């Protein structure tokens, strides 16, 4: 296990349902990003998750799988499994329900599992729609969810997820101020060095995903250089 995950400043999220060339994968893997997270919300299966893992594993970066559901969980050939619970949804399936179904599997490698407390804040994102997250909450409510996740539920990661749009830095700042032990992740809309540097002021780890597909690897490199 890569035990230094708490020190990662920049991680890159790759979607098994989207295509990258071999050259693009090589550039991403050698960009200076600290780790790769293999994750997506729609059309994610064990097969395409495993295929993406096989494409990137030769580069030696820490590999994390963040499954959308039990159907896309893999353990072989990866370092960690990030499992999200959505704090700001009233649909219990996304807090603990799907987790219960998954835990019926006797083959779970618990040593690789890292729980995440997701706070989803983009109502137009796939993750927002699928989970029924209440994305219109205030900064105070976000901070309260973050505090509960950290102090009460003891989640090791609190993840502010704007997924596809750039978020409010003040909300991220407030969330960071509310936690004492968890690592604060921020993901959403980071497509420039300036945005990466701004969110890195408040989050321990920034996540760059869509920019890889929408703006190219050059933009990813700029975000890495801004925070490393």
From Swiss-Prot:
The keyword Magnesium applies. Pathway: Membrane lipid metabolism; glycerophospholipid metabolism. It catalyses: sn-glycerol 1-phosphate + (2E,6E,10E)-geranylgeranyl diphosphate = sn-3-O-(geranylgeranyl)glycerol 1-phosphate + diphosphate. It comes from the Archaea. GO terms for molecular function: magnesium ion binding; phosphoglycerol geranylgeranyltransferase activity. GO terms for biological process: glycerophospholipid biosynthetic process. Its cofactor is Mg(2+). Mg(2+) binds at residues 15, 41. GO terms for cellular component: cytoplasm. Sn-glycerol 1-phosphate binds at residues 13, 159-164, 189, 209-210. Its main location: cytoplasm. Pfam families: PcrB (PF01884). Keywords: Cytoplasm, Lipid biosynthesis, Lipid metabolism, Magnesium, Metal-binding, Phospholipid biosynthesis, Phospholipid metabolism, Transferase. It is found in: Cytoplasm. It is an enzyme of class 2 (transferase). The keyword Zinc-finger does not apply. CDD domains: PcrB_like. Its EC number is 2.5.1.41. Belongs to the GGGP/HepGP synthase family. Group I subfamily. Prenyltransferase that catalyzes the transfer of the geranylgeranyl moiety of geranylgeranyl diphosphate (GGPP) to the C3 hydroxyl of sn-glycerol-1-phosphate (G1P). This reaction is the first ether-bond-formation step in the biosynthesis of archaeal membrane lipids. PANTHER family: HEPTAPRENYLGLYCERYL PHOSPHATE SYNTHASE, PTHR40029. HAMAP family: GGGP_HepGP_synthase (MF_00112). This is Geranylgeranylglyceryl phosphate synthase. It comes from Methanospirillum hungatei JF-1 (strain ATCC 27890 / DSM 864 / NBRC 100397 / JF-1).
């Amino acid at each position: 296990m890569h035990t230094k995950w708490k020190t990662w400043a920049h991680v890159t999220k790759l979607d098994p349902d989207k295509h990258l060339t071999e050259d693009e994968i090589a550039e991403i893997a050698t960009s200076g990003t600290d780790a790769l997270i293999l994750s997506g919300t729609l059309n994610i299966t064990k097969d395409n998750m495993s295929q993406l893992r096989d494409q990137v594993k030769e580069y030696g970066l820490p590999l994390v799988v963040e499954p959308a559901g039990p159907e896309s969980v893999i353990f072989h050939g990866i370092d960690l499994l990030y499992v999200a619970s959505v704090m700001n949804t009233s649909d219990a399936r996304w807090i603990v329900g799907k987790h219960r179904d998954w835990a019926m599997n006797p083959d779970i490698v618990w040593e690789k599992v890292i729980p995440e407390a997701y706070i989803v804040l983009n109502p137009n994102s796939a993750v927002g729609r699928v989970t029924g997250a209440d994305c219109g909450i205030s900064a105070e409510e976000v901070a309260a969810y973050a505090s509960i996740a950290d102090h009460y539920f003891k989640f090791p990661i609190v993840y502010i997820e704007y997924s596809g749009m750039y978020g409010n830095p003040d909300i991220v700042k407030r969330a960071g101020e509310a936690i004492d032990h968890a690592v604060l992740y921020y993901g959403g809309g980071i497509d420039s060095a300036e945005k990466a540097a701004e969110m890195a002021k408040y989050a321990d780890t920034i996540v760059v995903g869509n920019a890889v597909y929408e703006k190219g690897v050059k933009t990813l490199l700029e975000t890495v250089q801004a925070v490393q």
